[in-house]
Swiss-Prot record:
Residues 1-52, 69-100 are annotated as: Disordered. It comes from Homo sapiens (Human). This is Putative PIN1-like protein. Residues 5-38 form the WW domain. Residues 1-15, 87-100 have a biased composition (Basic and acidic residues).
């Protein structure tokens, strides 16, 4: 079976969280693809389109980025907000907070 054969250098098999499908990722050059890479090309097949873009986004580290932005804006997690915290609310959320 092809999955049991050794992958080319730099490639590893991963599982898509949303779909549960296996995909291949090259941690040296960073392409991701559904098809198993062959040993004779750097990309090894078709690069993701459509649904796989969601897979890539699902691996973003959203919480650390948000925490860094909050700290840069003067909001410290243990202080419950900082200067202008209400100004960054979505307009609908800000209206709810003001009782509108």
């Amino acid at each position: 079976m092809a999955d049991e054969e050794k992958l080319p250098p730099g490639w590893e098999k991963r599982m898509s969280r949303p779909s549960g499908r296996g995909y291949y990722f090259n941690h040296i050059t960073n392409p991701s693809q559904w098809e198993r890479p062959s040993g004779n090309s750097s990309s090894g097949g078709k690069i993701w389109q459509g649904e796989p873009a969601r897979v890539r986004r699902s691996h973003l580290l959203v919480k650390p980025v948000k925490a860094a932005l909050d700290l840069a804006a003067g909001n410290h997690p243990d202080q419950g907000g900082g200067p202008g915290a209400d100004q960054r609310l979505h307009p609908e959320d800000q209206g709810r907070r003001e009782g509108l």
